[in-house]
Amino acid sequence: KWFYLFAWLGVLVFGTWAFEKMLSQQKNPNQQVQTILTREGVKKVVLERNRYGHYVVNGWINDQLVELMVDTGASDVSIPETLAKSLQLKSGAPSTYMTANGPITAYRTRIDKMQIGDIVLNDVRASINPAVDDITVLVGMSFLKQIEFTQKGNQLILAK
């Protein structure tokens, strides 16, 4: 009798874990990206579009793992305030940004080191956004303009 109870409990726990992993992969199919090094020495990272049409990827800010979403419409890398505090980023001068939901005030900052795959940039301009509850960092043009990027089908190719 106890055996069946523990067996069903094990199936339930495993099923819940597998379902959560599947949902996580649907939101962020780029949890472990590979870097391709070309003969010319160019580093390329290929991102897969998620089921919602976005490019979400795990990356690093100042050697701390973060979730990133590519946003070519954003001027700067935009970091939610709660995450900026845990990354120990200093809040600078206020600046007004136009968003899809209207103007917001965010605070200028600099990221010492930002990394996607083996593509590493230093001293990246960013903003700390107090109006966002999420923990996903938007990768805006202050990062993207320093690399090459090409979108083909359901893939975004980053190169440096």
Descriptions of predicted regions:
Residues 1-67, 72-160:
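Pepsin/retropepsin-fold aspartyl endopeptidases
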